[in-house]
């Protein structure tokens, strides 16, 4: 089993490393910050194209997309490209009140904090226009409800507060497959007949005389 794990969390990393020692691929921009695990250095901005196509059974990441100074379309294109046909992509992101906002240019820590809520964030993932950012890239289940999967007793045992058990928020977990990617397939441009050069020349001369 092949697993690609961006910015691996200790609990999950320990589990996956035991589950598939040879197939677990934890990656991060700053791997030296991990003391509990050997992590491969990986820059999402420059390295996404290096991921082998159709390689991973599972790709997961939690709260990283708000940090990425690159197009979300670029990131998710390569995530789904690297996924196997029957693979699964699991992720969470800080879904917030309001509308989507993004700025990939230089910004001071103070301005970034004021605009996005945190100095190292480059986008605000608003729930009001969810279908126009994350929802435009892939089919996502907006009726998130952990109570349909786990009992209240299990949720309490995992210390998941009631406010985070359903709906769109920072704790919402999305699970997608290749079929959920909305931009899949080869895009074919609509056929547009080539313009008649003589007719176009006459139109231009007529316009220039008028001008």
Residue ranges and their predicted role:
Residues 69-80, 84, 88-200:
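S-adenosyl-L-methionine-dependent methyltransferase catalytic module, highlighting the catalytic core
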Residues 201-211:
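Long, low-complexity, intrinsically disordered segments
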Residues 3, 50, 57, 121, ...:
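Acidic/proline-rich low-complexity IDRs
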Residues 2-104, 124-131, 173-180:
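Conserved SAM-binding loop
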Residues 53, 199-202:
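Basic, mixed-charge low-complexity alpha-helical segments
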Residues 19, 51, 111-114, 119, ...:
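Alpha-helical structural elements
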């Amino acid at each position: 089993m092949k697993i690609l794990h961006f910015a691996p969390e200790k609990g999950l990393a320990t589990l996956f490393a035991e589950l598939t020692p040879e197939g677990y691929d934890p990656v991060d921009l700053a791997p030296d910050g991990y003391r509990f695990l050997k992590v491969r250095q990986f820059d999402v901005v420059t390295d996404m194209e290096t991921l082998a196509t159709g390689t991973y059974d599972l790709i997961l990441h939690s709260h990283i997309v708000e940090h990425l100074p690159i197009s979300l379309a670029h990131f998710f294109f390569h995530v789904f490209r690297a996924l196997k046909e029957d693979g699964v992509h699991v992720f969470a992101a800080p879904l917030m009140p309001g509308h989507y906002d993004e700025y990939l240019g230089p910004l001071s820590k103070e301005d970034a904090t004021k605009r996005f809520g945190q100095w190292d964030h480059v986008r605000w993932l608003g729930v009001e226009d969810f279908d126009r950012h994350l929802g435009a890239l892939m089919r996502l289940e907006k009726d998130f409800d952990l109570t349909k999967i786990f009992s209240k007793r299990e949720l309490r045992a995992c210390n998941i507060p009631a406010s985070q058990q359903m709906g769109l928020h920072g704790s919402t977990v999305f699970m997608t497959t290749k079929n959920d990617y909305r931009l899949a397939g080869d895009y074919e441009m609509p056929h547009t007949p080539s313009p008649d050069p003589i007719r176009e020349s006459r139109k231009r001369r007529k316009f220039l005389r008028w001008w």
